[in-house]
Amino acid sequence: MREKPFIHWVDITVNKLLSQKVDKHVINGGMAASGPIHIGKTRGELFLQAAVARKLRMLGEKVEHLLVVYTQDPLKAKPPLITPEFMKEWRGVRILDVPCPKGCCSNWVDHWMNPFYKVLDEFGIKDLKIVTTTEIYQSREMIETIKTFIKKRREAREVLGRFKGAKYPEDWIPFKPLCPKCHNISTTKAISVDLENEEAEYICPRCGATGKVKLSEGKLEWRLEWAALWKVLNVTFEPYGKDHAAPGGSRDSCVAIAREILGIEPPMGMAYEWVYVGGRAMSSSGGVSFDFDEWPKVAKPEVLKYWYYVSKPLTHLEFSPLKIPQLSDEYDRAERVYFGIEKVSEPKIEANMKRSYEIANNEEP
């Protein structure tokens, strides 16, 4: 029996997207500005999307590669990333309003995101549109989507309860106001909504403030936000972490919300595995990470990209700084194989090495 030819997982993904026959492919990733941007975050939220978007463009497709930065979230960081005193003072405050933890930048978000932005060119990331959730919440499309969720809150509560198992109270309003006084966006509560004037009446347990805010000043419950972003941004492809992939889990609940509440089809998805350090998943807020902007100081950017592309998205990857020389050697070997200097006995392994080397070099070795 003739063996099937090797097809790289990036190309398999592209072929699936081509079969959808959409006018424009909107390839989306998300980045939580909760702490340092580590290399683990970029596996499934940046490099996977970049490879797929690039190949689609090469095939003549209209493509938009997006990266959503979650700036409308509350501060959740904990020691050792921050001091207990800093955590006590700022926990629950919208991260855009949290000061720089080192006093060197304008705010928390800039402190962690600017180093990431500065090295994108070195990693060959081109044609990337970066948008923040704060900007999205100001848009007319998002405000209308918030109003839809408020109007259909009973149905939304039923869907969330079906998947999450949590019961929301009868007076639940799926909108978390941003307190204009202390910038709390974690424990505030909307107690009434005026849809005509697009305002929510709120109470803030953190500082005791009460009043009204516009629907552009706050955020949705995160599962509703996820589905809302699909709708507002017209997302057609979006990978997601394996923690969301379990049957009946968070992505399934968002799919149901998209279809049953918003009346849209969810984007094609792809689960990916985290990157680990010493058996623990890399975590910005928990301080277990290797910063993305540090990588070009110790190895070629293509080395990291090759590691991610030669491995299938759900492959468990264990990282240590001591592993960098090995990863560099593997990339150098792939280069020799690609240019015919070295041979590999197993055809599929050789084909994977060659194709992954191409992708790591933006299809232009």
Q: Residue ranges of each PLM-predicted region?
A:
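Charged, often glycine-rich, active-site loop that binds/positions anionic groups
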Residues: 72-90, 145-146, 281
